[in-house]
């Protein structure tokens, strides 16, 4: 820089300090009132040591004396040239004055202090490992070292050095500097050599030397004032701050690496070796969790094994792959075959003693043929009055006792079409089927369906012809109709027992009971009692007071209160209590006994199997295994055709939230809704569940624009108010038929009507009155049918339709009319501006007719 700014500070005799911003090229005028004896008061500052090569060493004392003499001459002078000095000259003279002052202090030092300094320097030298460039304060010293380089102390060179020159600088106090300089002037060359050797090392620490100086000052009784930090120049401060920041960053990095190494070493040292249980199938996520390892690490090992990049968390691994991965992470494993576990559970007790059990009888037939009434007559109960409109909506299980010790278990299934799946499940747990046929109605669709279920399940069947008391009852007609479906009665030479009964008049009920016991004896029904219990879920629901309630049929073993059961792939729990069909408490349940169980964590699906396990841990393992099997089956399903998805999205939807009292009702309603199909509209069941309507159901309906269908469940007042605020419709039903009928009506209202063109007449053009931009005015004759204002017109020329439009105006003479029939002339305004040929052009008249579509 040619020009730089600096601040010159002079301490006047009055004690005030005047500061002026000047340039290096400016001249300074020195006041003549300054006495010769006055010395410039300088703030002590830290100076830099610059290593320069020179041929000889300047005598510091002579330079100081000559500088002082020059200053005195300049101060005494009165001319303008003598009193005008540049800033650089003034700074040099101030340095000379300071050096002279330092020389006076050096002379005051005693030989004892020199000896002490020598001892201090020798002790520090022993600790120094590396040489360093040294900064000495306030003295222009030139100290020779063993090398060709010489150290020059210059207090004004801080602006001439770069950052690199300051990296190896050590700050020393002025007192140490003066003592070192004085020690260099001693005749004894040994001390000078020691100082020179000291300066060759870069390991001298300023703090240690400062400590030695402080101790020396305390011994002298004249402690030196410690320089304040504000005496540093701006450049030196900046360099020091940068160096401190860099050292701090290095220390932070060093601490971080040291901590990381400690953590790594500790983690490796304290890594736990786990024993991993490996089933037949396990996902990547599950394997990583069982090892407590990161998923990406497991994926990396899999990539090395298979070379596949697209490894998902839900991908399944077989036991061989999983075991290799476990060993790669230094864990141990144990193969667990959950399929074997389940097989062992169900095979337990196969070789035990078989004991006779009660028959399980399922009553099936068409709706309203008297199935529940017949059971009421047999049980001497009145269940049918509890059913809405006398139609059974739920599957029921009961047990009756005959002749003191003979027991029969009855399962009552709903008869209408919606419960086809329930009837199918009923045949899986039954031993004997009682097919109820009304004597007046005969064979109905659900009767035929029940016959097919019996044949598929290969179970014994008894036909009970009910309502035999009616005048139009015809038993022979019923037996002949059954023959057409492969059911041969004993009267016709077959093996199927046909019993005419009347539930209302209680006719032949004992004969029906005896027939059931006879077939049961022929079947020799037996089961193992002394083993873990297993069976089938007949029905399940949520009770607001007791929680989940499941109706079970025990098929094997003995179920006790306190047992842990697993039902299906989602429900398990400890049996808290059990009740029979009459509401009585039970402690144990033996084979063929229907029982209501409390204590499951979830609502199991009806028709699923249950089994008792040893612990809740084993129950969870079995649940997870069954869910994995389900996921594997779902993953094997073919990909959905994207073109079908686009078509599917174009279909209108009716969103439905379904809440029912029991799981069987949900399955029945979903089955019936699934049979409602149409190419332009469909029903989307967003959510289905067991229990009363809740606020969450209302909020979901609001979000999804759905209707809520409630079957045999209640809605409390708060939920009703919320639904009213949100304008959500809640429909309550007690018969499944009503739900299906309402859904069909709603879908019918959502369907857009079909528009069809129906030809209603024909016109022949007699005369063209005008043709313009506003249309053509034509004189026409109605040859057939009629013409209506606004009707669709198709202009035909040579059997080609050249124009389609509407009749804007229809007149008869000068009067506007709505229609003109055949055999009359009329005038029309047609929205067609091109040429029309009366001889060859014909106009066909059409009417748009909308056809209302109905969901059947």
UniProtKB/Swiss-Prot annotation:
GTP binds at residues 365-372, 412-416, 466-469. Residues 356-526 form the tr-type G domain. Residues 466-469 are annotated as: G4. The lineage of its organism: Bacteria, Pseudomonadati, Pseudomonadota, Alphaproteobacteria, Rickettsiales. InterPro entries: EF-G-like_DII, IF2_II, IF2_N, P-loop_NTPase, Small_GTP-bd, T_Tr_GTP-bd_dom, TF_IF2_bacterial-like, TIF_IF2. Gene3D superfamilies: P-loop containing nucleotide triphosphate hydrolases, Translation factors, Translation initiation factor IF- 2, domain 3. The keyword Protein biosynthesis applies. GO terms for cellular component: cytoplasm. It is found in: Cytoplasm. Its main location: cytoplasm. Residues 390-394 are annotated as: G2. Residues 365-372 are annotated as: G1. This is Translation initiation factor IF-2. CDD domains: IF2_eIF5B, IF2_mtIF2_II, mtIF2_IVc. The keyword Lipid metabolism does not apply. Keywords: Cytoplasm, GTP-binding, Initiation factor, Nucleotide-binding, Protein biosynthesis.
